[in-house]
Amino acid sequence: MATHILAKDILQKIIIENVPFSLALKQAFKNDSVAKEDRPIVSALVGCALRHYLVMERLIKDAYPDIESDGFVALLVAFSNALFIKKLNQDECNELASSFLKEEDIKASDFIAPYLEGKKLVPEEIEVGSFDFLSYRYNTPVSVIKMWNKQFGHVTASRILRANSKPAPTVLRINNNFISDEDFFNQYPDFEKCDVSGVALYIGEGRFKNHPAVEKGLVVALPLAYKEMVDEGDIDLLRGLAIYAEYPNDLLTELLARFNNLNNIEFMAGTYSAFINTKNALNKHAIKGINVYEANASSIITCVSKPVHTFIVMPDSSRLNLLQVLPDYFLRFDINKLDELIANQSKALNEAANQVEDGGYLLYLVDTISKKENSGVINEFLKEHPEFTLIKDKLYFPYKKFGGSYFFAVLKKQANND
């Protein structure tokens, strides 16, 4: 199949059928005889079209009000290749797009031409600095921009948007069971130290996944929030650890970098995908000391037979960290679900709190920047549970050196003799 047609089909699956970006690429490359040298080009074009989707959608639909999905996606391919990728045959891209247009419609090549000559993508009638302008410029839903602007102010909201438009830094967790920080940095100059022990930033030029330190299992990608959260919490496996998570995550990576053996752990996966992700991770590392259940927040009490010393809660959230990581996440984000998510986060915390022993710890982590899901949830919890005290909380912004959009809170339950 021709690369421009394949790119169109992949985009159609993502935009129209709501197939996730990575899965759509995987399916296309598996089921189609695509030359290896063409795959990076197709991936880049699809990603680029998604990264500029909101403004391109506006321009295409303004020029072609009655265009159907096939024509719209074909124009996305032609537009993205002409302006950014420039690797596919542009005449073939234009011809494919034009085949879906009406006779009276402007030709695809004529539609694209002004932008090749310097015409700005954001329409002139959009006020510079307005929410719509920022949405088109940074490919972010207006609802998210308004929320950040209200919660953090214009300057911080703009910094978040600018950071999200750039690739996320590669933050790594050093496996200190295998190598000390000092030896690691002495042996591998492609990594930069962090103020937090056991954490590094990849600054090498080659692909991180192909680095010898990765192949040896000495380091793995992991957001800084995991390490700092667990540093603040008191995890004593002999006294019990419980985990409730509603999405696939890398918490086990952090635990494996700390403990030689993982035992006496109850892991409740709130979704099937989290359950499978966890089971696969346990099999990969041959871990036997973790019991895994597929259970929602209401079932926590049935999975944890007695109070534990530490309970880590990782409920679903708006997951706005993914705006920087996944080019198609903005298509799936729905701000109307925010109240439902917050109610569920509170439910998970309340249920877990009942299973924390006196003097124990309750840890909360979400991968999003949203005050209502961050400090808002924690403050409401503390009002209802005076027996808990906030030890530390921290919000991570993507414009910081080690990046990421995360929030964690560490709470301690009052002991009987406190």
Go through each PLM region and give its residues.
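S-adenosylmethionine
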Residues: 1-418
